[in-house]
């Protein structure tokens, strides 16, 4: 599995947390609530495209909103490969942090 950058890891964690409710707005809101970050939608969407090209996420269109001219939301889910990459990345961080003074609460 290839290397995951920090923002890619945060996006994948947001997807894991949101499950079937993950789309641009909910992903960004989760990043703000849980990680204290408010990235631009451009940063979120470009990262999602890159993760999809790597086979770590899959996107699909939901039903259009029930209002005139309502758009369909583009939902995103983790693939098994994405879940595995996230697990490996997290394990590497835990191993690196093990025994480093001042990192545990």
Regions found by a protein language model. Give the residues of each.
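Short secondary-structure boundary/capping segments
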Residues: 3, 49, 66-68
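Amphipathic alpha-helical dimerization/coiled-coil segments
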Residues: 81-105
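Alpha-helical residues within the helix-turn-helix
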Residues: 29, 52-53
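N-terminal helix-turn-helix DNA-binding core of bacterial DNA-binding proteins
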Residues: 2-43
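Basic amphipathic alpha-helical segments that dock to polyanions
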Residues: 44-51
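Beta-hairpin "wing" of winged helix-turn-helix
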Residues: 54-69, 77
């Amino acid at each position: 599995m290839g290397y995951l950058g920090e923002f890619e890891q945060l996006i994948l964690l947001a997807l894991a947390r949101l499950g079937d409710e993950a789309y641009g707005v909910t992903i960004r809101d989760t990043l703000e609530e849980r990680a204290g970050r408010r990235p631009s939608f451009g940063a979120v969407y470009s990262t999602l495209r890159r993760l999809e090209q790597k086979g770590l996420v899959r996107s699909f269109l939901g039903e259009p909103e029930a209002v005139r001219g309502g758009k369909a939301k583009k939902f995103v889910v983790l693939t098994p490969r994405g879940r595995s990459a996230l697990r490996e990345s997290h394990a590497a961080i835990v191993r690196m942090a093990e025994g480093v003074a001042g990192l545990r609460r």
